[in-house]
From Swiss-Prot:
GO terms for cellular component: cytoplasm. Pathway: Amino-acid biosynthesis; L-arginine biosynthesis; L-arginine from L-ornithine and carbamoyl phosphate: step 1/3. It comes from Buchnera aphidicola subsp. Schizaphis graminum (strain Sg). PROSITE patterns: CARBAMOYLTRANSFERASE. The keyword Repressor does not apply. GO terms for molecular function: amino acid binding; ornithine carbamoyltransferase activity. This is Ornithine carbamoyltransferase. Its main location: cytoplasm. L-ornithine binds at residues 168, 232, 236-237. It is an enzyme of class 2 (transferase). Belongs to the aspartate/ornithine carbamoyltransferase superfamily. OTCase family. It comes from the Bacteria.
Amino acid sequence: MNCLYQRDCLRLLDFTTAELKHIITLSEKLKKTKQNRQEIKLLKQKNIALIFEKESTRTRCSFEVAAFDQGANVTYLGPGSTHLGTKESIEDTARVLSRLYDGIQYRGHNHKTIEILAQYSTVPVWNGLTEKFHPTQLIADLLTIKEIFPNRNFSDIKCAYVGDSRNNIGNSLLEAASIVGLNLYLVSPKQYWPEKNLFIECKKIIKKNQGNIICTENISEGVKNADFIYTDVWVSMGEHHKIWKERIELLKNYQVNDSMIKMTNNSKVKILHCLPALHDQKTSIGKSILKKYGLKDGMEITDNIFQKHQKTIFEQAENRLHTIKALLVSSLIKEMNF
């Protein structure tokens, strides 16, 4: 029987090394079948609930297209369209949806909510993003890394994550690196290093997988000889403007720009970004933030670097679809002959 059948995905430490690599391998296969228009609909007569307390582009589209490609039906429950935690308890919502659906995706503010959903649900629950973790993004990132270096072990690859290392991407990247043995440098001011207990937990795991995790404030040390530089936006729209000012001031030297690229000593270094990116002033939010804080050329990444590396960044975005599809198939199909 498929060992991932009926399994939740709340965080990447829910999986063993073999299980996570299986999902990545299945993602590669499903990507090829879609590209070759040979997709087999394995999820016919399956129904999936998509709970979005936070708005989304890539995550929602990826879950919906993945489900449709595989023959499943979805119900989108957007912000304000459920009674979750207000008129109806999270526990009761989980019990009700489990009677109607074969799986539940949740994207919201509080990780505790998805833990309760999973506890009281009798069907798989998948984390589309919480304030603590973003596992589906990191599975896509690992697929992207593997596609770029198909013949290298993760333990032979160095990834430098620059910016806020304690956010959900930083946390999930820490977990991903520990499971597959990626050499990860978290390049941030000390205030933005990961939570201590999570770091210690991942440090223990990565020793078994031949990789390493290092936190440093030193940008040149952190990015030297990196195969990948990964960044993310520094501010969230739900945070107070006072936090923005403090964070931008502390992180402005950690912008991915020409100077940082030179520090890598690697002319072939690749850039990863989970998107959306504040690299120009073509959005109302981007224009407002960059003008308000005197940022002339992007925030976390300059437009020049973003455009040079857009092929990798948008391949990374597309891979959300294929990896989420692999996650759905893995947890909803009992016997897999694929």
